[in-house]
C-alpha cells in the first residue's frame, strides 16, 4: 500500500497542479462576475408619448393665442371704422361725396334714369354686351337701365338692387351723388313751376292826349 501511494504522488507534475488551481479560480471569478452584472432596464415607451403630448399642447396654445389676437384686432378695426363714419361731415367739404358713397340712391332718382330696350343695333358708348353685376349677356328687347354721365348699362333689377346700397357705378366707380342731387333739384323746380297757378295779367292801355285847340261857337 505504501509503495502505490508514493508512486501516484510522484507521477503528478507540479505544472498540472498549478493549471488546475488557475482554472478553478478563473471559473469562480466568472461566476461572481455573471452574478454581479444586472440587466439594464429597457427605456419606457411612456417617455416618448409624454414629449409628444407636450408638443401638441404647446402648438395648440400658440394657435389659440394667435386666434384671440386676430379677433381682437378685427374688432378694434371695426370700432375705429364705425367711429370714423359717425363723425359729422361738413356739407361744403371736398370729401362730402366720398363719405356718402355707400348710402345708396333714392328711388326718385332711380326712376329718372334712362331705360332702353336692348338690341345689337344700339351703338351707345358705355353699353356693353353683358351686365357687369350678374355677368349674363343682354337679350334682345330686354330692358336695360343706363346710368347718367358714364352711360353704362345694366339689368334693371341688378342696378336697382346695387344702387340701393351703393352710390357709384359698378363698372367705373363713378360717384352718382352729385348727379342725383342735380336731378332732384331739377325735378323740384319743375314741380314747383307746374303747381304754381298762373298770375292774372293786367294790361293798361294809355292813349295819347289830343292837342289843345280853340273851340268856336257859332250862333
From Swiss-Prot:
Any GO molecular function: zinc ion binding
Highest taxon, organism lineage: Eukaryota
Pathway the protein contributes to: Protein modification; protein ubiquitination
Compartments where found: Membrane
Keywords (A to Z) from UniProt: Membrane, Metal-binding, Transferase, Transmembrane, Transmembrane helix, Ubl conjugation pathway, Zinc, Zinc-finger
SUPFAM superfamilies: RING/U-box (SSF57850)
Enzyme class, broadest EC rank: transferase
Reaction(s) this enzyme catalyzes, per UniProt: S-ubiquitinyl-[E2 ubiquitin-conjugating enzyme]-L-cysteine + [acceptor protein]-L-lysine = [E2 ubiquitin-conjugating enzyme]-L-cysteine + N(6)-ubiquitinyl-[acceptor protein]-L-lysine
Domain statement: The RING-type zinc finger domain mediates binding to an E2 ubiquitin-conjugating enzyme.
Protein name: RING-H2 finger protein ATL78
Species name: Arabidopsis thaliana
Gene designation: ATL78
Amino acid at each position: 500500500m505504501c509503495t502505490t501511494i508514493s508512486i501516484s504522488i510522484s507521477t503528478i507534475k507540479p505544472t498540472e497542479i498549478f493549471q488546475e488551481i488557475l482554472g478553478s479560480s478563473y471559473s469562480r471569478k466568472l461566476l461572481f462576475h455573471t452574478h454581479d452584472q444586472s440587466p439594464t432596464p429597457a427605456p419606457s415607451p411612456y417617455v416618448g408619448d409624454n414629449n409628444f403630448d407636450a408638443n401638441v399642447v404647446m402648438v395648440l396654445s400658440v394657435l389659440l393665442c394667435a386666434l384671440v389676437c386676430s379677433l381682437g384686432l378685427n374688432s378694434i378695426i371695426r370700432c375705429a371704422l364705425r367711429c370714423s363714419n359717425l363723425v359729422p361731415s361738413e356739407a361744403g367739404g371736398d370729401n362730402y361725396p366720398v363719405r356718402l358713397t355707400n348710402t345708396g340712391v333714392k328711388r326718385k332718382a332711380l326712376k329718372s334714369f334712362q331705360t332702353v330696350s336692348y338690341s345689337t343695333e344700339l351703338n351707345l358708348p358705355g353699353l356693353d354686351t353683358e351686365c357687369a353685376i350678374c355677368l349674363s349677356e343682354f337679350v334682345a328687347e330686354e330692358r336695360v337701365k343706363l346710368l347718367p354721365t358714364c352711360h353704362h348699362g345694366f339689368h334693371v333689377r341688378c342696378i336697382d338692387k346695387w344702387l340701393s346700397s351703393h352710390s357709384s357705378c359698378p363698372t367705373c366707380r363713378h360717384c352718382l351723388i352729385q348727379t342725383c342731387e342735380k336731378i332732384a333739384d331739377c325735378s323740384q323746380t319743375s314741380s314747383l313751376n307746374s303747381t304754381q297757378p298762373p298770375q292774372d295779367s293786367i294790361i293798361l292801355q294809355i292813349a295819347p292826349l289830343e292837342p289843345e285847340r280853340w273851340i268856336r261857337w257859332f250862333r
